[in-house]
Structures are given as structure tokens and as C-alpha cells.
Amino acid sequence: MKRYLLAIVLLLPFILQAKVAVEKPRSKQPTAFAIVVDQATYDKTAPQIHAYRDVLEADGLSTYILRDNWQTPEQVREQLIALMRKTAKRSPLEGVVFVGDIPIAMVRNAQHLTTAFKMDEDNFPMIQSSVPSDRYYDCPDLQFELIARDTTDRLLSYFNLACDSPQRLDPAFYSGRIRYPEQLGGDKYEGIARYLEKVVAERGKVDQLDNLVTYAGDGYNSDCLVCWMDERVAIDENFPLTDTRKAGNLRQLNFRMDDYMKYRVFDELVR
């Protein structure tokens, strides 16, 4: 009996690893991209995810789809590091998007790496004084120490940035999230599906950027107006179709303009 138990224990890591389903790219491109999605979201939105994959490959990205019933951030990080190493020579991993309910790393002991967030970690609850950060995923050189799993939100895990870890941010790839806000109500899977359909539709349009809105918030380098002296030059160089002579084409907002600037920002998003 003990031999059987020992065999099961030894095989357990391989069994868990085998659960992750990896859909390989349909085309070979210079760089690679990964869609990381939870199994429930994939089951409800598979056609939209595949259509999204196809437009990414049309843009020149060999796109992988990684899906599983993700339980911890460690599982996701392990798979991304493995994929990054696998693709390093022939098609380096360029970026990742997390779709649906992907575990979130709540990072502590790292406020020297944040731009504006500063809070006493000793006197405030962990949920408030920790930083939800995907640098846990896209900075594989950083070292973390697990503190605890959240008891009310299964997606949250708390980590300390280790003292012997590199103390800088140097992402190996870019990352983003597609997640439906619970505050909106309704079916989150339908919401994600609609969003992906919209993304695919927009990718099929020939529509060059000719309207731009910028916003400089409080508690960042926007406090120093000198830092923004050359912003107009940078905008002209990067967005040549934005006619800076027309007020409606380029709007630059600053937190000093109003006591409650978020409503003006919301208006711009609606516009």
C-alpha cells in the first residue's frame, strides 16, 4: 500500500501539469503571443477566442492558447515560464493576455516599485495594502514568497517580494487582461464574448487614429509640469494623423483642471 501511495505522490506533479491544455499556433511568425484562459470561460466563448487568435496571427503573432482550471498564480507563472523558454530561440514570446478568471497575485513589500500607491502594510488590511500586479507573471526574474490565499476570493493570493529578489521591473513580455467587471451584472461570459467580437470586428477595419485624449493624474510625474513640455512633440511624432491644431482631435487633461476630474475622463471615454 505504501508503494502505491509513494507512486501516486511522485506522479502527482506530472498529472497536474498534464491538465493544462495548450493549443499551438496555426502559423509560424517571428514572435509569439499567448492567450491564457480559464476552462469555464473557454467553454462559453471558444468561437470568439479562436476568432481573436486568428486576427492576432494575421497581425504576425504565432498565438498559443493555454487553458485550465487555474487554481493559483504559481500554476500560471510556471506555464508561462515554460512557454517562454520553449519559444525563446525560434519565436520569442512577445506578449500575453489573461482572459476570464485568472489568479491574481497581491504583492507586498514592493511599494518602492510602485509609482503612486503608498500604504502602511502593518496597519491596514492585506486586501487594501497589497498591490494586485501582473508583474508577478511578466517579470520572471522576480522572486516571491507566498504569504496566504485569500479566504473569500479564490483568485487572490498574497506574496512578499523576496529580499534577495531583483529590486527592479524588467518585463520579459507585455501583458494585459480581459475580465468582465462583476459590478456590471449580467452574464460575464456573454460580456467577454461580445468584447472579443468587437475586437475582431475592429481589427478588420482600416481606421487610423486621428483623435487622442491624454490625462495626467495626481501623485505621479504629472506633478512636475516641466516633465510634460515635450509631450506635444512626442504626440506629433507618434500620431501624425492627430491634427494638433484642432481642439477636438487632441485633448490633454490634467488633474488640476477640476476638483472631480474623473467625470470629465468618463465623458471622454463615452465620446
What are these regions (language model features)?
Residues 19-271:
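Cysteine-dependent hydrolase recognition
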Residues 1-21:
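Bacterial Sec-dependent N-terminal signal peptides
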